[in-house]
A protein has these predicted regions:
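Conserved alpha/beta catalytic core and glycan-binding cleft of carbohydrate-active enzymes
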Residues: 7-129
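Short acidic catalytic loops
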Residues: 1-2
Length: 129
């Protein structure tokens, strides 16, 4: 929702009023929705499944963020699954797959997930990965 050109070819989308690909209406929608939910003070948690490098997903709208409580760390999931596929002997040469996330882990309020996307549409079970 954040990008006007996501999943589209050239000519299939129209730039915003500033000439870029940000979906300004979607950005304002998320900011407003998350402000309302956070304002209720009932302990609701709002989690973004956002796989791009969009900045400030978990910052408050007052800080020009989208206002989500947490963001999935899709990079960690990918690296973790790749690491686990390796023969245990070769893992010692690939520990960077498990430690790379430390370089950006404080940029957002991340949660570590194993996505349902990894097992749907005739993909194998998580245990077989």
């Amino acid at each position: 929702m954040l990008y006007l050109d996501y999943g589209r070819q050239d000519g299939q989308w129209v730039p915003n009023k500033y000439g870029d690909n940000k979906n300004l209406e979607a950005i304002e929608f998320f900011k407003h929705l998350n402000s309302v939910i956070r304002g209720r003070k009932d302990g609701a948690i709002i989690i973004a499944e956002e796989s791009t490098a969009w900045p400030k997903v978990t910052k408050s709208p007052e800080e020009d963020g989208l206002g989500f409580t947490f963001k999935w760390n899709m990079g960690w999931m990918h690296d973790f699954l790749e690491y686990m596929k390796l023969d245990p002997y070769f893992r010692k040469f690939n520990h960077n797959k498990m430690t790379f996330g430390i370089t950006y882990c404080t940029s957002e309020n991340f949660i570590l997930v194993l996505s349902h996307d990894e097992v749907v549409h005739l993909k194998c079970s998580m245990i077989n990965k």
